[in-house]
Amino acid sequence: MFAEDILRDYGSFISEHDGKLKLLRDKVPNRDVSESAQCVYMSPVVEVNFMGNDSMAPDRSFEESELVANKPLTTLANLCNQCRNLSRKAKRFQLAFLFSDFRLDDTLPPHTHTSEGSAGLEGSLVRMSSSMDFFCQVYFLLNRMIVILQNLWRQIAASVSVPMDINEVHIFAVFDAMSELLEHIVVFNELANQSKISTMWALYKKWLMNLSNSQSANLELNGLSTSLMDIENLITKDFFRILLDNLMELKKQFGLNSVSPITQHSNAYIRRQLLDVDANPSNELKNYEDPKHIIRLTTFVVVVHELGIQMEGKLVKNVIDLVARHKQVPLNRSVFWSPSGFLSLHAKTLMKSSARSQDGQGPKVHSTVLEKFRLSDQRTCRQLGVQLSLWSIQMQRVFDVGVFGHLKTFLQLILNGHSYADQVNLLAVALINRHVALMTPMTRNDWIVVSRLLQYLKVIQKTFESNQINFVRFISSLIQWQKQKVIHLLHTTKKKIVVLKLLQRKINFLATIKLAEKSIMGFPSKQRLTFVNLALGEFLDNRLLPADNQKLIKSILHRVNSISDIMRNIGGQLNTSESSSLVYNHWFLDTSVLKEYTELQRNPYSLQNLVSVSHHLDKIMAMFRGSRCPKQSANDLIIEFLSNHLEFFLRVEALSHLFQSQDQPFQQSALDYRLCINAVAVENDGDYNIIKDHLENYFTATFYNLTTIAPHDWKSYEKMRHLANKVLQLQPIDDHLPNQIIDQGIDVLQIMRNIHTFASSYAYNMNLQVFVETNSRSKHLDIIGTRHVANSVQTHGTGIINTTVNFIYQFLRQKFYTFSTFLHDEQIKSRLLKELRFHTEHKHSKSYQSYPYERADSFLKKIRRLGCSSNGETYMDLFRKVITQVGNAVGYVRLLQAGSKNANFRNRSYKTRFDSNFSCGGSKVHEATEGSIREYEKSLGHMKECYSDSTNYFKLLLQGFQPFLCNPHNHHLRTFYLITPALIMNYIDYRVKQKLKIYKKDQTKISLFEDGFAIGLVYILNMLNQQTEFHELGWSQTITQHLNAERSKVRDILAGQQRTAPEQLDEKLHQTVAITERHVNAYEHEYNLLYATLSSSEIFFQ
């Protein structure tokens, strides 16, 4: 217990501390966005990383060579590595730039002059200030790109000026790295020009300078102005023009001997880029789906033109035609780029002889062609799903059997996984970009294809993450195996080069191969492999080597490159640096489509992948947007759907016995989601979302609330809880609510406050000690018994009995006032006085043995002639109801006393077997212990007092009213016993009619018993001291004689008919006699029950 308390306190402290940190983080306006952008990849809890440290310079392990050719290769390799690092960082910054408008959240126009508009605009400017650090980093990044591009051109010019045979292959690799940087500069330029920041920049500068004038020195203002001018170059100006201006300085440094080789290589590179752009002529939307090729080609052509490098006229014409065909290229969902406008702005001389311009902002595609693309995407998605399933099975099989005997298969599986991930990523981005370029909204099927592709990416990522230990063990061996192959091929190639006749070329080739061997001997990091690619690129296209060796070297290099970066590529397909388009487009995914797609997932594995990828992308968006995503995640949607669906399933199963048997039950296609309950937990922002726990909590709360609202239907919810446990394997917590059976129901306090309603709407059974509701709107009748009262007494304490008796006393006062008013009425009092004179005159005569039946019947008929109420009841019926309500109130007192005894009897289990005295006497005990002993003895004494029969509430109720009702002034009450015969006759008629109604339908207010009348009658007779006078009437004897006379009269009629015509008995007469006899028997039965109840009731008041 002590350890549990410590853990509970520690947990509450951590929760409170976490809440304070989250609150503080939400309140801080200046949240560093770029810091979060650098830590995007969410690694698992335990991750094994076998990648080498790429930050180590690869040339540290190289030996300095005497040949000059080694230094250009090393320099170009380092510059290409820097280009790759800058590109990876640029992708992260581009995604953060895309969400910069969301962070501003400027919903009010700048010209609003109201206080709310000023406050909203100032808030946007404050958030803009918090992003200045991020814009500074982007500015530094772009400046670094300009420096790298200058160094690249300078190094290329220096390399080609050396009189050596440098092949085009490694120059093309340098041009590829350069084009990639140019692409990122164009993207940053368009993002800045088409964002809200550029429109608000002038206002922001004015606001910032006004804010700083009163609080800053001149030196600080000068520094601020300089910084703002630098950032303004990024946001409002053409940064690509700044790049071209910086490159113009290099034009003066180019010598005549370097211009011609650069021109030759540049034209060859442009020619190759044109072939890549037009590689798939069947898909005319290829460059819209993946616009990087046309962006790189256009930017490279502009840079070459700006440097004054001569391009072939045919190449220029082809480039202009290509640009004219692509008016607007989508960079992402909200930013477009115009290649023709870009060329017109930066290379006007090339556009002078431009081809015919095409109207329209985008390609015109017929709906049938678009439908063809949609069907092709769905078919490709299905094929990728099948291939990934087979790939994952084969990968697991290789791990189970052992990799060392299947290194070739293992290598092929890794490369296939890498290829599948690239295909999935490209297909998803291409589908989105195609719709953006065509300006057509994505349909539900398109979003479902994108969601399924995201699941495929998560499947590949999980396959590699779940087998990290095996990859660490086997990939090292695999790399060693491939390295030995590469080294063997290098030795073979070296032997081939020895036969060359040109000494200088032979020395250069041998030195390059030697450097490649030294590079490949270490761990094949990206820096090392970049150098190897550039080094081997010098003779890959050389015709002196055999074609088979060239092909094999290309294949081996490609595999080594893929394996060296396999963990980053596969694990990073959902990372922002690899697929920023997917992350940004996931923000626009419609919640209704995501909800519909999640409802289609009936496999826990696919559901888990969808929830995991949704969490991953939402988490990345929250980092870049600076706040949580307001949309519902896939986990919330699936939990909401499963909760509603499984609740409906449990309701149907619980009520299945009410359904009729179906003729064809197998035609109903009911979806089974039970397997989704066992989906594995998914981590999100430090919390693990477990679908099973959410469902158990939902059903626990639902069953509790429904049982509280409708306690009469507690069995249905208990059955649903049982089905949830047995069928769904869920364990909802028991609600521990009292079930509404005989010993549970309406609370005693509620009855006490509504005693007038209770006495009129419940019927009392003296033998069973229960009250039963006479009329109810529901299907069930409420029953209140001894155990129910005992439970209420245990809940509220025994003191509630005295309070309830006081309420009943007040209720009886009202009823006795009505009782006295009725007997004081002149119509009633005069007739009772007449009956009193008759009874007084004849009670001593021998012929007068009992009160005549005829006089009671006549008295009842005269009362009936006085009139009826609105619902057809006579005054005698209303008076009988008053007596019954008085009896119900007295019977409820008896039920309370019995329930109190039952509760005290239950409490005896806490009492010791021996009547020991716990008083300490002279012993010294703690004060708290002594106080507990006193409270225990006090409670025990109170229980004994309540359990004993010393308190007789019937006598208290008699003594409370007798002084007033037996007052000589209330002489009209002395004749009450004379109305009892008529009152009993009215009661018997009422009970007989009630029991006849039981066999009829649609009858309300029917009761099998009503012992409250007998108790009320005996209670009033005892209170008025008229019990002896009532017995002197001998009414039971009168009723017996009357019923015997009626029965003999029926027999005489039947005997007379038999004597007159014994052979011709009337059938109708027989039926009439049978009905009359049955009626007499019913009256006799009711009279016997009444007199038995009256005799039992007299015992209570003795």
From Swiss-Prot:
Its main location: other. The gene is SWIP. It comes from the Eukaryota. This is WASH complex subunit 4. Belongs to the SWIP family. It comes from Drosophila melanogaster (Fruit fly). Acts at least in part as component of the WASH complex which may regulate wash nucleation-promoting factor (NPF) activity and is required for its membrane targeting during endosomal sorting. During embryogenesis, not involved in the wash-dependent developmental migration of hemocytes anteriorly from the tail. GO terms for biological process: endosomal transport; endosome organization; nuclear envelope budding; positive regulation of cell adhesion; protein transport. Transmembrane segments: none annotated. The lineage of its organism: Eukaryota, Metazoa, Ecdysozoa, Arthropoda, Hexapoda.
